[in-house]
Amino acid sequence: MAADDKIQMWNPNTGRPDVKIDRAKFDAVRKAILQALPRKGSAIPFKELPLAAELNLPDGQIPGGGSVMWYVTTVKLHMEHEGELERVAGETPQVVRRVK
């Protein structure tokens, strides 16, 4: 992986760019989240998403290391910004639903 092979994360709460993360980590976490929400309309409480995603990660870990909770949260926010996921309105605690 090239040193500059990073992807810019976006935060839907601010509409602004957030951190940049390694593309390999992004791809692995995004895939794990989508596997945890296998169909359009699938939903899961956010507090359960990190464990559900972790079960779909290679060896249950972030490739190259890192906090599963941090990466799942960061990638989930980016996926909300991109319209792949959405928060279910009126649900407390937060529930996340697959849109695409």
Protein language model annotation of sequence segments:
Residues M1-Q35:
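Long, low-complexity, charged/polar intrinsically disordered regions in eukaryotic proteins
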Residues E80-G90:
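A short, conserved structural fragment
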Residues A43-P63:
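Short acidic, hydrophobic short linear motifs in intrinsically disordered regions
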Residues P63-H81:
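Short amphipathic alpha-helical interaction segments
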Residues M1-I7, I44, L51-A52, K76-L77:
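Eukaryotic partner-binding/assembly regions in large regulatory complexes
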Residues A32-K40, A52:
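Short amphipathic alpha-helical elements of helix-turn-helix/winged-helix folds
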Residues G90-K100:
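Short, cationic-aromatic polyanion-contact patches
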Residues K40-G41, G60-S67, E84:
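Short acidic, glycine/proline-enriched loop segments that cap or flank alpha-helices
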